[in-house]
């Protein structure tokens, strides 16, 4: 009986440590995707100049690998996929899905256009304006126990085959790599959400004249 009580006391004593170890191992486990948190801008945009638009995302990165050598050593199971997480009020499940990079950009820009009351249409008509997003940089690095993320893209408003106006957006961030915690997604999300919302879509569409 005494041995049983001693065994129970030892379990109670070391249980928190065991739980912490299991949590740490679970947190350290590499995933096949990077979590990307995105929130639509709180400010409602002005009434758009158009109600329909085409949307195109192209990959113009010089380096198509989103991870540096050192970052890939940490994220060994990453398969070029991104879990898009959105948590607007009133929704139970914030996870939109897991996408490749191009689809990730398409999804969030569709959300922004939808928020503005603009319908994204699949059309070959030159009369319908097109928002073309060219991803130029998307790079996650890990150096000296810090995550570094850089991102850039160029948005162009195209109509009748002509580029009417364009806006270049870029930025970067860094975050300490805390042992036992995967901060890669947090580092990416901080820059990604900010830069997506930096694009002034209303201003781009404002370049369309009534005649166009």
Q: What kind of feature is each model-predicted range?
A:
Residues 28-49, 114-117, 163-212:
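C-terminal/domain-edge helix-coil "capping" segments
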């Amino acid at each position: 009986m005494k041995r049983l009580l001693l065994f129970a006391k030892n379990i109670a004593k070391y249980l928190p440590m065991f739980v912490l170890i299991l949590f740490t191992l679970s947190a350290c486990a590499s995933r096949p995707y990077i979590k990307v948190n995105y929130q639509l801008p709180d400010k409602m945009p002005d009434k758009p100049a158009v109600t329909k638009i085409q949307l195109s995302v192209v990959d113009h990165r010089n380096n198509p690998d989103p991870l540096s050598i050192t970052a890939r050593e940490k994220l060994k199971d990453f398969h070029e996929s991104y879990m898009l997480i959105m948590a607007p009020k009133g929704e139970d499940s914030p996870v939109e899905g897991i996408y490749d990079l191009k689809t990730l950009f398409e999804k969030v820009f569709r959300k922004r256009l939808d928020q503005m009351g603009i319908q994204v249409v699949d059309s070959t008509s030159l009369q319908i304006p097109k928002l073309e997003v060219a991803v130029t940089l998307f790079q996650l690095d890990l150096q000296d126990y810090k995550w570094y993320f850089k991102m850039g893209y160029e948005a162009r408003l195209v109509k009748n085959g002509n580029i009417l106006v364009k806006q270049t957006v870029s930025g970067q961030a860094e975050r300490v790599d805390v042992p036992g915690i995967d901060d890669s997604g947090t580092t990416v999300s901080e820059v990604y959400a900010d830069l997506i919302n930096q694009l002034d879509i209303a201003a781009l569409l404002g370049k369309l004249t009534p005649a166009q």
